[in-house]
Amino acid sequence: PEVDVTKSLRNQKVNHQEGDMQVGYDQNPQFSPDGKYLTWVSMEHDGYESDLKRLCLYELATGKKSYVVNSDNLETDVNEYCWAPDSKSIFLTACWHATVRIYQVGLDRVVKQVTDDSWNDYGSLAVLNNKQLLASRHSMLNADDLYVITLAKKEKKAEVKAITDENGHIFSQLATPTVQQRWVKTTDGKQML
């Protein structure tokens, strides 16, 4: 809606779409590089801190709001995100089976996993250029270091290369423990990691 500068914020029109019960916690707003979109991480319900964190997209020219990531196309929370330089997709981190992976989602809502299923947690996500990302990564075996992720056309096939090895001199003196997945059956018959 248009802003009427002669009225206070309380008396402005509200952009409220049919069925939009946007009352939950919103955070991390970002404009797309081309300035056409505003995105933010959004929870649906007020006062429910375990609510799913979705990625909301607002098209500035039309006032249309949609969710490029929600439970329909990614069954986990959006942690952090950054826009691709061409404004056609968004890179994000999300936790799946106790590891934080990097994903890419287009404006068409198609989600592609960028990194593989290894036991690592990625964070501090940033775009370096059209083909590379910069991120921190740690695991149960290694402390945080910085990595360059070179994108690939195939899902889960990005090349991941360490550019720091801050604690390598310490880890080289230690025996490497073994880390294993352990799934247990829950009381309702499901599997839990």
Q: Where are these predicted regions, by residue range?
A:
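Short glycine-rich, flexible loops that bind phosphorylated cofactors or substrates
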Residues: 47, 99, 142
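Residue-level detector of Asp-centered blade-edge/turn motifs that repeat once per structural unit
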Residues: 33-34, 85-86, 128-130
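A structural signal for beta-strand boundary/capping segments at domain termini and interdomain linkers
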Residues: 189-191
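Conserved beta-strand positions in repeat-built beta-propeller and related beta-rich domains
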Residues: 93-95, 137
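Terminal RNA-binding accessory module
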Residues: 102, 193
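Structured, non-catalytic alpha/beta "coupling" segments that mediate domain-domain communication
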Residues: 126-152, 157
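Multi-bladed beta-propeller domains
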Residues: 1-27, 42-86, 95, 104-123, ...
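Hydrophobic beta-strand positions that form the internal "hydrophobic ladder"
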Residues: 35-38, 89-91, 114, 132-134
